[in-house]
Curated annotation (Swiss-Prot):
PROSITE patterns xrefs: ENOYL_COA_HYDRATASE (PS00166)
GO biological process: fatty acid beta-oxidation
GO molecular function: lyase activity
Location of the protein in the cell: Mitochondrion
CDD domains from the UniProt entry: crotonase-like (cd06558)
Species of provenance: Dictyostelium discoideum
Chain segment of the transit peptide: 1-14
Gene Ontology cellular-component terms listed: mitochondrion
Protein name: 3-hydroxybutyryl-CoA dehydratase-like protein, mitochondrial
C-alpha cells in the first residue's frame, strides 16, 4: 500500500488529494468537539474539527465512528444553537483515503453499493441536528471533503484554499449526495462544470460561482464562521431551527434517491479500468490517461 501523503506540492495538475490510512499517527480522537466561549460563557455554539491533519483530514470509516459519536453528543446538548464544522491543520478535508479506494476495486459491485451508501450517510448524519451548520473551510476541500461542506447550511472559505469535485478525473461517479446538493446551491450550469470538469478552483472563485457565502483570508475563516454563528444564535432559537428545517426540506426530499443512485453508479465504476488508472496516476503523481487512444499526444 502507498504510505505517503499526497499534498498540494506533489499533485500534478490538480489531481485529487489523497492519503493512506497506513500512515502512523498517535492514537487520538479523529473528530474533536469544542464549546465556543465568550467571556468564559458558553454561547450555544459548538466547533467540530476533523482531526487527521497529517493526512489532510481524509474521510474514513474509522473517522466516521468518532464523527457519529460527536453528532450524538451534540444532539444531547439542550443549549445548542449552531455548529461550526472545520478541519484541524492546513486542510478542511482533502478527499478520500487511498487505501479505502484500493480496497473498493477488489470488492463486488453489490458490496460496494452497500458500503458507499453507508459511508455517505455516516458523514451526512450531522444534518440530523436541528440547528444551522456552518462549514469553515480553512484549507483544501477536495472530493468527498467538499461534498461534506456542500451538505452544510452555510460555507465560509479561505480565499486561497483549493476546492473541487475531482471524481470524474479519478474515474468514478460523484458521491455523498453532491449531485443533488450542488445543483440546489448553484444550479445546473455550475454544477455540471464542477462535476464534469473535475477542475480545482480557489476559494475566491468558489464565492464568485455561488458555492460559498464568503471568501476571506485563511486566518479569518474560523472567526468569520463563528461571527456568523453568533449573529444567528442571538435570534429566536425556535424560529431559527424551524426555518432551518424548512430550508432543508427541499434538499432532503430527493436526497435518498440521489444517495442510492450515486452509490449504485459508483459501484459500477469500481469495476472499471478507469478507476484503476486513476489510482495508479495518484500513486505516480501524474495525470490519469483516461480514453488515451482519443488523443494523439498520449498514444
Amino acid at each position: 500500500m502507498i504510505n505517503r501523503l499526497f499534498s498540494i506540492n506533489n499533485i500534478k495538475n490538480g489531481s485529487k488529494f489523497f492519503s493512506s490510512s497506513t500512515t502512523v499517527e498517535t492514537k487520538q480522537p479523529l473528530v474533536l468537539l469544542e464549546k465556543h466561549l465568550v467571556n468564559g460563557k458558553y454561547t450555544g455554539i459548538q466547533i467540530v474539527k476533523l482531526n487527521k491533519p497529517k493526512q489532510l483530514n481524509a474521510l474514513t470509516f474509522e473517522m466516521g465512528v468518532d464523527y457519529k459519536k460527536v453528532v450524538d453528543t451534540l444532539a444531547e446538548d439542550k443549549d445548542l444553537k449552531c455548529v461550526v464544522l472545520t478541519g484541524e491543520g492546513k486542510a478542511f478535508s482533502a478527499g478520500g483515503d487511498l487505501d479505502f479506494l484500493i480496497e473498493r476495486t477488489k470488492d463486488t459491485p453489490e458490496n460496494n453499493q452497500r458500503i458507499m451508501e453507508r459511508f455517505y450517510r455516516t458523514f451526512l448524519y450531522i444534518r440530523s441536528l436541528p440547528v444551522p451548520i456552518i462549514s469553515a473551510i480553512n484549507g483544501a476541500a477536495i472530493g468527498a471533503g467538499f461534498c461534506l461542506a456542500l451538505a452544510t447550511d452555510i460555507r465560509v472559505v479561505s480565499n486561497k484554499a483549493p476546492v473541487g469535485l475531482t471524481f470524474t478525473k479519478l474515474g468514478i461517479h460523484p458521491g455523498m449526495g453532491v449531485t443533488h446538493s450542488i445543483t440546489n446551491i448553484v444550479g445546473q450550469d455550475v454544477a455540471s462544470y464542477m462535476l464534469l470538469s473535475s477542475d480545482i478552483i480557489k476559494g475566491d472563485e468558489a464565492q464568485r460561482l455561488g458555492l460559498v457565502l464568503k471568501s476571506v483570508e485563511s486566518d479569518q475563516v474560523l472567526p468569520t464562521a463563528l461571527n456568523l454563528a453568533e449573529t444567528i444564535s442571538k435570534n429566536s432559537t425556535i424560529a431559527v431551527n424551524s426555518t432551518t428545517k424548512t430550508l432543508r426540506n427541499k434538499y432532503n426530499s430527493d436526497l435518498d434517491k440521489s444517495l442510492t443512485r450515486e452509490a449504485d453508479a459508483q459501484s459500477q465504476c469500481w469495476a472499471s479500468k478507469d478507476i484503476v488508472e486513476g489510482i495508479l496516476a495518484i500513486r505516480e503523481s501524474r495525470d490519469p490517461k483516461h480514453n488515451y487512444l482519443l488523443f494523439d499526444d498520449q498514444k
